[in-house]
Amino acid sequence: MISKKVDTQVVIIGSGPSGYSAAFRCSDLGLNVVLIEQYYSLGGVCLNVGCIPSKYLLHIAKVIKDVKKLSRIGISFEKLDINLKEIQCNQKKIIESFSSGISNLARKRNVRIIFGYAKFLDANSIFVQGEHDSYVVSFNKIVIATGSLSKKLSYIPYDDIRIWNSSFAVSIPSIPKKLLIIGGGIIGLEMATIYSALGSNVDIIDNSHDILPHLDRDVIDIFKRSVNHDYNIFFNSNVIKIVQEKNGLLVHIAENDNKNKRFELYDIILVAIGRVPNTDMLDISKVGLKTDNNGFIKVNEQFCTNIPNIYAIGDVIGQPMLAHKGTHEGHIVAEVISGKKHYFNPFVIPCVSYTEPEIAWVGITENEARKNNINYEVSSVLWNTLGRAVSSQCSEGVTKLIFDKKTNKIIGGCIVGSNAGELLGEISLAIEMGCDAEDLALTIHAHPTLYESINLSAQIFQGTITDLINKKIKK
């Protein structure tokens, strides 16, 4: 079969948030663009098996949890009735709607889409194998935005249909009676939130000493108390062996010191131990692209690799693996390719664990401030002091801000609570714009709201708080 010849200025490999953002911005800047995607549904992991479908399920989980809370105040409903097919159908409609939207945007921008697997021939051409046709695409510049894949463990029998990864789990193939999640990171916690709400008995096993160990323990302790009755988390533990039985998967679990060992039978095991770069099929060694020890492509502040006309963005270049970071990188790399002197230099990148309650953070943590010998001060407001939180049955939360005592500027913040991710934007903007505590304290916030906790935290630092005891007033 003779390959079709295609010549273009810019090629983007991957149609996730990083890839399509780069493609569309390049087109808007007047460049001729070809977008390569291996699957027929555009949007990458985020849209198809990640961010969007999981948030749909997490919304369902939140509603279920909120309904159960109403029994505390005299309102109860009949037994929960879950129509799994209807849930799956609605999820599919959401994905198709957004994927179709991306296709329409590409068409209106004259971005050509080629479906197939790409691999490098040399630094200025790739081979793309589609379902029916193959292509040799020549280009001036290329952007690798192929994303990431679920990391695998060598001792896991992945050929067993009872072993899931997060991409499969988000499709809700079934609701297991007993579910083991290996990995207590954000993905593991979100999956536990979903399946426990739907009725599964969920255990999480993680080999670290605590969940999200880079965050401050005071805020994480509030989260753990809130989910204490939803699922079990076993720290400092590892899965040693999995035995495939007819009636389930027999898991040999041991603590890190190997002193305490036990066997547990599970219906399903979900492996969520992190992600690895999706580069194996690209044949990047042919062009000599440099990677780090974990296989992530090395880039500079303009996302250029060691090959001058080859760029990389998104998950494929490493942590933090966040769609919104990738989108921003897509915009920057397009500006660079078009000849502008743009660089990736954000002060902060917000992060959210979309559990219930949510955990959202940005900037420096207290632990980091201490390690870096920053003269800082913490200012926190517990949500059980917020009228909106108490009246909305979501009082298990906290808003914690970190201020630099020399400049009074806000340098970090963490929120645990319902819709914490939606509240984080003000803190992110405040850090990015160099706001100090007075800026936040003197900005009138609506009452009663959850976001006024940011204002109150700033008032505590300023020593002007009236809604709580002012510990800075000397009598």
UniProtKB/Swiss-Prot annotation:
EC identifiers of the protein: 1.8.1.4
Binding positions for NAD(+) per the UniProt entry: G183, G184, G185, I186, I187, D206, V239, A272, I273, G274, R275
Keyword presence, NAD: yes
Substrates-to-products reaction catalysed: N(6)-[(R)-dihydrolipoyl]-L-lysyl-[protein] + NAD(+) = N(6)-[(R)-lipoyl]-L-lysyl-[protein] + NADH + H(+)
Disulfide bonds: C46-C51
GO BP annotations listed: 2-oxoglutarate metabolic process
Active site: H447 (proton acceptor)
Function (record text): Lipoamide dehydrogenase is a component of the alpha-ketoacid dehydrogenase complexes.
Family in the record: Belongs to the class-I pyridine nucleotide-disulfide oxidoreductase family.
Protein name listed in UniProt: Dihydrolipoyl dehydrogenase
Organism (species): Buchnera aphidicola subsp. Baizongia pistaciae (strain Bp)
Lineage: Bacteria, Pseudomonadati, Pseudomonadota, Gammaproteobacteria, Enterobacterales
